[in-house]
């Protein structure tokens, strides 16, 4: 999914487009000696030569005495007929009796400008026609500018409807995948053009201020902000481990999480989780939004009874609300609660984040409410599993509310 103007839009795996259009062509039919054609009787016609449009043959039929005997030769009739052995041909038509005075006041009957009313006309078989039995009153024709020197000029336009399907375009040249991230990583590794050095423990990492500023609002303010120092060329980092800072730099340049096992030199799950926890804290420190989300997702995926307490403490410290809610739900599960309380991380949690016990109690109580009956049993269950009596719980809640008011 992508977001445009706040609206999520689907990004499909493949696309195709159907183009419904007309293939147009025209034919001009001239009738010399109109007066000699009169008296042929109704239903008799003069046919144009056959012409082709859109891969089909067509012909113009002119009826000097009209097509219907009921009209008693009061009207001329004009039609366009399908001359091909084809079925169900859909088309638009236009028949025009040309003004020969030069004024341009032609007599036009067009289907093109009425296509939306009922769609194209369908000719079912060879000989099917479209046109008008009462195209023009004959007495008016014979005194008009459409007839000149005993000559009529008829123009016919046909638009055959075609559907054309287009899929992804195939090119002979293969478009390579973007290697921008790798190019920037090579720039970082080679130290070409670096203008800032970070002293992290016993390690020194060089980088480029512009790239750091483009990726991190914190670095941007530090180097180019109103109170920043663009002339600084060395910064000492005291609160991040070297391996964590190196991993963070790699992400800044590549937008890809580095191989954690290679950085830690261990394949154990605990080393992985510990690394991601520290990387999440670093991402929060430098406001790397995408890295924060990636780390939160990984911690949720790797959550277990041994690491949930330390992850919950981290989420509380940095106010990662979604991660915190996920951890609370995990701990409150009857299948996990007992084992979590026996972990070393839980002991640390009670000491470092005592206010979390109140929230955890509420979460356990809510989970307990859905699985047990009897309000008193639920209260005893929720408080006892956390090793608290109800007096301590009330005191903890009051203390929590005071701390919240003090902060706000």
From Swiss-Prot:
GO terms for cellular component: cytosol; nucleus. Gene3D superfamilies: 1.25.40.420, Apoptosis, Tumor Necrosis Factor Receptor Associated Protein 2, Chain A (2.60.210.10), Potassium Channel Kv1.1, Chain A (3.30.710.10). PROSITE patterns: BTB (PS50097), MATH (PS50144). Residues 194-261 form the BTB domain. Pathway: Protein modification; protein ubiquitination. The keyword Cytoplasm applies. Residues 24-158 form the MATH domain. Its main location: nucleus. It is found in: Nucleus; Cytoplasm. GO terms for biological process: cellular response to salt stress; protein ubiquitination; regulation of protein ubiquitination; response to osmotic stress. Ubiquitous. Belongs to the Tdpoz family. The BTB/POZ domain mediates the interaction with some component of ubiquitin ligase complexes. May act as a substrate-specific adapter of an E3 ubiquitin-protein ligase complex (CUL3-RBX1-BTB) which mediates the ubiquitination and subsequent proteasomal degradation of target proteins. This is BTB/POZ and MATH domain-containing protein 3. It comes from Arabidopsis thaliana (Mouse-ear cress). The lineage of its organism: Eukaryota, Viridiplantae, Streptophyta, Embryophyta, Tracheophyta. The gene is BPM3.
């Amino acid at each position: 999914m992508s977001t445009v103007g706040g609206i999520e839009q689907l990004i499909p795996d493949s696309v195709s487009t159907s183009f419904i259009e007309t293939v147009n062509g025209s034919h001009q039919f001239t009738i010399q000696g109109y007066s000699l054609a009169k008296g042929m009787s109704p239903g008799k016609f003069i046919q144009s030569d056959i012409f082709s449009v859109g891969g089909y043959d067509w012909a113009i039929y002119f009826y000097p005495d009209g097509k219907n005997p009921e009209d008693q030769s009061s009207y001329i009739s004009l039609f366009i007929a399908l001359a091909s052995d084809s079925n169900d041909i859909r088309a638009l038509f236009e028949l025009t009796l040309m003004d020969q005075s030069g004024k341009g006041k032609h007599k036009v009957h067009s289907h093109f400008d009425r296509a939306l009313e009922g769609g194209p006309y369908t000719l079912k078989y060879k000989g099917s026609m479209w046109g008008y039995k009462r195209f023009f009153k004959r007495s008016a024709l014979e005194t008009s500018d459409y007839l000149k020197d005993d000559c009529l000029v008829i123009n016919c336009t046909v638009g055959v409807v075609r559907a054309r399907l287009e899929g992804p375009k195939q090119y002979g040249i293969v478009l390579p995948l973007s290697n921008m991230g790798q190019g920037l990583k090579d720039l970082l590794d080679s130290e070409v053009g670096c203008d800032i050095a970070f002293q992290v423990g016993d390690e020194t990492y060089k980088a480029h201020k512009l790239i750091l500023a483009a990726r991190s609002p914190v670095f941007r303010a530090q180097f180019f902000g109103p109170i920043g120092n663009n002339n600084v060329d060395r910064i000492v980092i005291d609160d991040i481990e070297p391996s964590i800072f190196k991993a963070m730099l790699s992400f800044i340049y590549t937008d890809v999480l580095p191989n954690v096992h290679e950085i830690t030199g261990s394949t154990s799950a605990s080393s992985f989780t510990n690394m991601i926890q520290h990387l999440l804290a670093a991402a929060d420190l430098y406001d790397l939004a995408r890295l924060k989300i990636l780390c939160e997702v990984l911690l949720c995926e790797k959550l277990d009874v041994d690491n949930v307490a330390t992850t919950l403490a981290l989420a509380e410290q940095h106010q990662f609300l979604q991660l915190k809610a996920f951890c609370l739900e995990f701990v409150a599960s009857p299948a996990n609660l007992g084992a979590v309380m026996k972990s070393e991380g839980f002991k640390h949690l009670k000491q470092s984040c005592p206010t979390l016990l109140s929230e955890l109690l509420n979460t356990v109580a809510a989970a307990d409410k859905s699985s047990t009956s009897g309000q008193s049993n639920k209260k005893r269950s929720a408080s006892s599993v956390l090793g608290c009596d109800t007096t301590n719980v009330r005191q903890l809640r009051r203390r929590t509310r005071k701390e919240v008011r003090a902060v706000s």
